[in-house]
UniProtKB/Swiss-Prot annotation:
Function text: Probably catalyzes the deacetylation of acetylated carbohydrates an important step in the degradation of oligosaccharides.
Binding site for Mg(2+): 59, 122
Cofactors (names): Mg(2+)
Enzyme Commission number(s): 3.5.1.-
Any one GO BP annotation for this protein: polysaccharide catabolic process
Similarity section: Belongs to the YdjC deacetylase family.
Subunit and interaction comment: Homodimer.
Superkingdom of the organism of origin: Bacteria
Entry GO MF terms: deacetylase activity; hydrolase activity, acting on carbon-nitrogen (but not peptide) bonds, in linear amides; metal ion binding
Keywords of this entry: Carbohydrate metabolism, Hydrolase, Magnesium, Metal-binding
Stated name of the protein: Carbohydrate deacetylase
InterPro entries, per database record: COD_ChbG_bac, Glyco_hydro/deAcase_b/a-brl, YdjC-like
């Protein structure tokens, strides 16, 4: 079985960026997703251009910060995206507004000089029933995989692919993670593990309710014990190059 450890939130804060880089250089992270238009975007880009082996996708934003397009249908009265707690309740999104914003974020990413490996989203926003079909079309337009959280089924990528958000908060630990991966190994060819390694900085503490746990994630993801266990159980660490383009391909 192959595993993608994808670090979310690249570009959120400098501490997040530095944590992701350490998890890449000293650990198991080979893939990350960038939040464009966020405070540490340029810092992330500078780091990324020094790390040719780190594959970088786009972490689409619909619940954090301001839209690049200024689309009022996507925001509250202050011009920021609808808060996470209200986002999932809304059913009045305009398809054109969603599409234009997603395209704007992809184009912004490409203008940064980065190679787009795949798409996913902050708070899994792309699985919202109104956003899901639109973001799927955007992924097809740019010929990149889209993180699958049950939207298209287990074989959406032409292989037995599975996304897991198990590695989070109260479930953090080497033993629980390995037990989970070994259970999945019996059923899947490729598993994506969502992770959020970071060094906590003041901005992260201000903007995220999930902060201190990120340093524990970083410790685990750079653990020699974890790396040794993955090797011992014939679990190969990979990135989104194993999914050439969604959904018409095989895991390679």
């Amino acid at each position: 079985m192959k595993v993608i450890f994808n670090a979310d939130d690249f570009g959120l804060t400098q501490g997040v960026n530095q944590g992701i880089v350490k998890a890449h250089l000293d650990g198991v992270v080979k893939s990350t997703t960038l939040m464009v238009g966020m405070p540490a975007e340029q810092h992330a880009v500078q780091l990324a251009k020094q790390l040719p082996e780190l594959k970088i996708g786009l972490h689409l934003r619909f619940t954090a910060g301001r839209p690049l397009t200024g689309e009022r249908n996507l925001t509250d009265e202050h011009g920021v995206f609808t808060a996470y707690r209200d986002f999932w309740q809304r059913r009045d999104y305009q398809p054109e507004a969603i599409y234009h914003e997603a395209i704007a974020q992809v184009e912004h990413f490409l203008k940064l000089g980065l190679t787009l490996s795949h798409l996913d989203s902050h708070h899994h926003a792309h699985t919202h029933p109104q956003l899901a079909p639109i973001i799927y079309e955007v992924a097809k337009k740019y010929h990149v995989p889209l993180r699958d959280i049950g939207m298209a089924g287990e074989e959406a990528f032409g292989c037995r692919y599975h996304f897991t958000d198990f590695f989070y908060d109260q479930r953090l630990g080497i033993d629980p993670l390995m037990k989970h991966l070994l259970e999945l190994k019996e059923r899947f060819d490729l598993v994506e593990v969502m992770c959020h390694p970071a060094f906590v900085d003041p901005l992260l503490e201000k903007c995220s309710g999930y902060a201190k746990q990120r340093e524990e994630e970083l410790r685990i993801l750079t653990s020699a014990q974890l790396i040794q266990l993955l090797v011992a159980h014939d679990i190969e660490i990979t990135d989104y190059s194993a999914l050439i383009s969604a959904p018409l391909h095989s895991c390679v």
